[in-house]
Structure formats: C-alpha cells, structure tokens
UniProtKB/Swiss-Prot annotation:
It comes from Tupaia glis. Residues 1-22 form the signal peptide. It comes from the Eukaryota. This is Apolipoprotein C-II. The gene is APOC2. GO terms for cellular component: chylomicron; high-density lipoprotein particle; low-density lipoprotein particle; very-low-density lipoprotein particle.
Length: 101
C-alpha cells in the first residue's frame, strides 16, 4: 500500500511540476486578481481530479483479491484475540482493585 501512495504522490507532484514550469515572459508582477485565483483553483481541482482518477485506476489494476481476503482474515483473528485478552485483563484488574472480601 505504501508503493501505491508513493506512486499517487509522484503523479500529483509530476502534474503540479509541469504546471509550475511556465513561460518566464508571461509572468507579471501584478497582484493576483479574483478571476486569476478562480482559474488557478479550477486548474488545481482538475489536476487533482485527474491524479486521483489515475491513482484509482492504478489501484483497480493492482488489486489482488487473495491479499485482501488474507488481510480481512488476519484482522478478524487479531480483533478476536485482542478482545479475549482485554476481557482477561479487565477481570484481573477488577479482582486486584476489589480485593478479597
């Protein structure tokens, strides 16, 4: 799952890096207007959506049902064990606090 996250992060940074490399002559020292901010927000939103779609598509392609089933099985077994040991710990704690009466 870490590699998927890194790949998605790489795609986002690549898309943003390509957007940042603009023509130096087109840069101006004017304050940002509301229309420019709206355009930048829309551009960022579209790039984010495309990166998200690419990451989702990559996840769909690399999805392994056997691994997912193993993870679900390990989760259910570990939660059952934790529940059992938490109950034992709670009983021991109550018996220590209550003492012998």
């Amino acid at each position: 799952m870490g590699t998927r996250f890194l790949l998605a992060l790489f795609l986002v940074l690549l898309v943003l890096g390509l957007e940042v490399q603009a023509d130096p002559e087109s840069r101006q020292d004017e304050p940002a207007s509301p229309a420019l901010l709206a355009q930048m927000r829309e551009s960022f939103s579209s790039y984010w959506d495309s990166a998200k779609a690419a990451a989702q598509d990559l996840y769909q392609k690399t999805y392994l049902p056997a691994v997912d089933e193993r993870i679900r099985d390990m989760y259910s077994k570990s939660t059952a064990a934790v529940t059992t040991y938490a109950g034992i710990f709670t009983d021991q704690l109550f018996s220590m606090l209550k003492g012998e009466q």
